[in-house]
């Protein structure tokens, strides 16, 4: 069977051109394209990781086309000949979500698949805890026409995030990974829910209290005394949490022996001897000026 197409100009048949397309040749070309996409040299799983999607609190939904640039390039080249007989399959879709907010916060993530050609929606998860890391795994149970995918009417991922944190702050990061395949055969599968695999939080970094690193940190910022030949030996650190008590304040009453004197507009601080017989330990005839002259500036 042959399909004949003729192009004629308005001036007549003199400038016309005709060509024949063999149906068998079309099918042979479609088979070759399908085989190329399933060759072992390309790997059994042609997974694509495009980029990371940062999900912002309350921002507009993020929309990502799940057709790789390689497949779009093939579609644009082959569409005039076999585009009507080719399909795009999404046999594997993985969505890795990593939260950016703490467990003490709250939020939810909505993920959907949208077939722009048909207008249909498939729920991946409509109320995922934004504080929980996980991997979603699934597939789309129908084929996308190659001619629709070439025009941009393909399968799209739609993600929206809402949290109790500041507006437009990063709630989490989503890493979409998928496998798209060109084939001349359609798929007809029973729709199934996406699987969700939670990711547990890890333990704190083991060398957080590494004595050697802390010693190096101190030595970089501390000048050793004169005559020091050896570095201080590291000791085992035992972190302790202790609630400090309320600070005690000693007030010195004004009187004849303690005049209210200031220097340059600021009242100087005096060390009090709490073990003196009078409790305050302020000698008779004490003045701030004499204290500064005798104790703080003895050589002046």
From Swiss-Prot:
GO CC terms in record: host cell plasmodesma
InterPro entries (alphabetical): Bromo_MP
Record keywords: Host cell junction, Transport, Viral movement protein
Pfam families in alphabetical order: Bromo_MP
Annotated GO biological process: transport of virus in host, cell to cell
Compartments reported by the entry: Host cell junction, Host plasmodesma
Function: Transports viral genome to neighboring plant cells directly through plasmosdesmata, without any budding. The movement protein allows efficient cell to cell propagation, by bypassing the host cell wall barrier. Acts by forming a tubular structure at the host plasmodesmata, enlarging it enough to allow free passage of virion capsids.
Family that this chain belongs to: Belongs to the alfamovirus movement protein family.
Name this polypeptide is given: Movement protein
Organism, as annotated: Alfalfa mosaic virus (AMV)
């Amino acid at each position: 069977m042959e399909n004949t197409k003729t192009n004629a100009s308005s001036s007549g048949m003199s400038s016309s051109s005709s060509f024949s397309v063999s149906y068998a040749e079309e099918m042979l070309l479609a088979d070759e394209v399908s085989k190329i996409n399933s060759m072992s040299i390309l790997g059994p799983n042609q997974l694509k990781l495009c980029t990371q999607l940062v999900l912002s609190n309350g921002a507009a939904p993020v929309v990502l086309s799940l057709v790789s640039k390689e497949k779009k390039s093939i579609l644009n080249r082959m569409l005039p000949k076999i585009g009507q007989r080719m399909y795009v399959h999404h046999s594997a879709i993985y969505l890795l979500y990593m939260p950016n907010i703490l467990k003490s916060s709250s939020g939810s993530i909505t993920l959907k698949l949208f077939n722009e050609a048909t207008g249909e929606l498939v729920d991946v998860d409509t109320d995922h805890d934004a504080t929980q890391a996980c991997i979603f795994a699934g597939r789309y149970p129908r084929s996308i026409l190659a001619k629709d995918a070439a025009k941009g009417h393909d399968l799209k991922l739609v993600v929206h995030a809402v949290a109790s944190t500041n507006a437009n702050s990063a709630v989490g990061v989503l890493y979409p990974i998928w496998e798209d395949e060109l084939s001349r055969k359609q798929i007809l599968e029973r729709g199934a829910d996406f699987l969700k695999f939670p990711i547990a939080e890890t333990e704190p970094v083991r060398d957080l209290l590494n004595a050697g690193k802390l010693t190096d940190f101190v030595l970089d910022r501390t000048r050793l005394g004169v005559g020091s030949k050896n570095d201080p030996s590291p000791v085992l650190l035992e972190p302790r949490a202790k609630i400090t008590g309320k600070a005690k304040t000693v007030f010195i009453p004004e009187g004849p022996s303690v005049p209210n004197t200031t220097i340059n507009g600021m009242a100087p601080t005096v060390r009090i001897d709490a073990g003196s017989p009078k409790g305050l330990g302020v000698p008779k005839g004490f003045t701030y000026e004499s204290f500064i002259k005798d104790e703080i500036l003895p050589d002046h």
